[in-house]
């Protein structure tokens, strides 16, 4: 397995973003370029992961590594994908600035965030006992919801935020009312998620932290995190309304011919109704249909839709009120 591989290939009933390869390649051309190393706030230094062209092009400009604090000893959030150039850049940056590391905090298990851990331990052996992750491996330390990490100039509080992955953690930088959002909220576009309902509940939890600035694992600094989270929620709720409307219309159309009809449809039929025939088969099968299935499962959990099985085929419908 290539260095850092193992994130987006395993993730994702909600949206297999690799199916949007061509779209993302075009989108990436419009992304603003970011410097390899940038002091983005008095307490936060960002180092790019040198992985902008990863196997599924979802790392945007690359995975962001954050060096946090103001003193000679600082902590680091995420470790990139295991790209040798990233390790060299980290070593040079820390040496030039006279910085040592006390803690390594990992937002989640995906390889583009954890791939650099072996390089860090190789360069700084004392970190072998200072790698922290929720649901840790045998060689890692646990992170619990509400756990506090302190270095000079920075108090970092862990917040369990599942959705993109079950072990996902965000970190609140108390002094700045900032949040390291990991992959739950990106600097550009929207994220892929494992479980839509869980992710949406997590967004409300993130919203409740009342942070103003977001430091995402991919993309630019989010200057108004409250607005960004609100927009993400609004977008997903709008999609739910569109799905419900399509199911109601299917029921109404069938009931025009048969009084007690449910108008039940398959995921494939629903995608065809909502997106038309202009979308390629690959995107339909690998992205839109799994995403639609996740939306329907969330709506079913909410009691808004139901399904029946006909001839081993699951068909969804809007129940009567």
Swiss-Prot record:
Positions of disulphide bridges: none
Pfam families documented for this protein: Lactamase_B (PF00753)
Biotechnology: Notoamides have been shown to exhibit antitumoral activities. Notoamides A-C show moderate cytotoxicity against HeLa and L1210 cells with IC(50) values in the range of 22-52 mg/ml, but the IC(50) value of notoamide D is greater than 100 mg/ml. Moreover, notoamide C induces G2/M-cell cycle arrest at a concentration of 6.3 mg/ml.
GO function terms (MF aspect): hydrolase activity; metal ion binding
Signal peptide start-end: none
One GO term (biological process): secondary metabolite biosynthetic process
InterPro entries: LACTB2-like_MBL-fold (IPR047921), Metallo-B-lactamas (IPR001279), RibonucZ/Hydroxyglut_hydro (IPR036866), Sec-metab_biosynth-thioest (IPR050662), WH-like_DNA-bd_sf (IPR036388)
Cofactor(s), by name: Zn(2+)
Active site positions: 112
Keywords, alphabetical: Hydrolase, Metal-binding, Zinc
EC number: 3.1.-.-
Keyword Cell inner membrane belongs to the record: no
Cofactor note as given: Binds 2 Zn(2+) ions per subunit.
Described purpose of this protein according to its UniProt entry: Lactamase-like protein; part of the gene cluster that mediates the biosynthesis of notoamide, a fungal indole alkaloid that belongs to a family of natural products containing a characteristic bicyclo[2.2.2]diazaoctane core. The first step of notoamide biosynthesis involves coupling of L-proline and L-tryptophan by the bimodular NRPS notE, to produce cyclo-L-tryptophan-L-proline called brevianamide F.
Membership in a protein family: Belongs to the metallo-beta-lactamase superfamily.
UniProt protein name: Lactamase-like protein notP
UniProt organism field: Aspergillus sp. (strain MF297-2)
Gene name per UniProt: notP
């Amino acid at each position: 397995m290539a260095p850092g591989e193992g994130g987006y290939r395993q993730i994702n009933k909600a949206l297999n973003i690799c199916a949007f390869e061509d779209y993302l390649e075009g989108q990436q051309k419009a992304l603003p370029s970011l410097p390899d190393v940038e002091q983005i706030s008095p307490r936060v230094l960002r180092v790019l992961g040198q992985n902008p062209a990863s196997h599924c092009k979802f790392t945007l400009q690359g995975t962001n590594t954050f060096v946090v604090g103001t003193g000679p000893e600082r902590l680091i959030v995420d470790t990139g994908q295991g790209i040798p150039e990233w390790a060299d850049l980290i070593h040079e940056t820390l040496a030039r600035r006279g910085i040592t590391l006390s803690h390594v905090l990992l937002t989640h298990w995906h390889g583009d965030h954890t791939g650099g851990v072996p390089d860090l331990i190789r360069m700084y052996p004392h970190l072998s006992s200072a790698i922290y992750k929720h649901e840790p491996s045998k060689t890692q330390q646990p992170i619990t919801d509400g756990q506090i990490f302190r270095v000079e100039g920075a108090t970092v509080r862990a917040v369990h935020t599942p959705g993109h992955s079950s072990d996902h953690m965000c970190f609140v930088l108390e002094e700045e009312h900032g949040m390291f959002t990991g992959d739950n909220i990106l600097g550009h576009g929207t994220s892929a998620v494992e479980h839509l309902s869980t992710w949406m509940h997590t967004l409300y939890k993130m919203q409740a932290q009342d942070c103003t600035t977001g430091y995402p694992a991919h993309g630019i600094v989010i200057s108004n995190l409250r607005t960004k989270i609100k927009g993400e929620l609004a977008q997903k709720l709008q999609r739910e309304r569109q799905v419900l409307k399509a199911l109601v219309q299917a029921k109404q159309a069938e009931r025009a011919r048969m009084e007690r009809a449910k108008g039940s449809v398959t995921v494939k039929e629903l995608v065809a109704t909502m997106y038309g025939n202009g979308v390629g088969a690959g995107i339909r099968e690998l992205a839109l249909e799994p995403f639609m299935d996740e939306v329907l499962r969330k709506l079913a959990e909410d009691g808004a839709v139901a399904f029946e099985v006909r001839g081993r085929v699951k068909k969804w419908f809007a129940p009567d009120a």
